[in-house]
């Protein structure tokens, strides 16, 4: 993976996800951070991206709205999206997957769980 966008309104969460990616060997990828869905969408439009990791609850544009925009874009439609959230529940997880999320991970996500999700994505 060459470029990964991390969208979360918490700087601490973004730093933690960045650290998880480094631990599992993706630290060489270009890791780009956004504080909300609107910033993330802007970054996704700028340059080809291999993966979007997004929080669900963010100001300005939440993760579900971002996911809808990504999946409705002809250019971004095939972009894998993992939602990482503390607001997860089975019904919400089903809803996000129906919108096109590759997976939904609960915070705090561990490097092992993130690695397993990414391995599923690659295979």
Predicted stretch roles:
Residues 11-32, 99:
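Two-component/phosphorelay signaling modules centered on CheY-like receiver
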Residues 33-51, 68:
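Acidic, metal-coordinating helix/loop segments flanking the phosphotransfer/catalytic sites
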Residues 55, 85:
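Active-site residues of response regulator receiver
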Residues 109-118:
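C-terminal output helix
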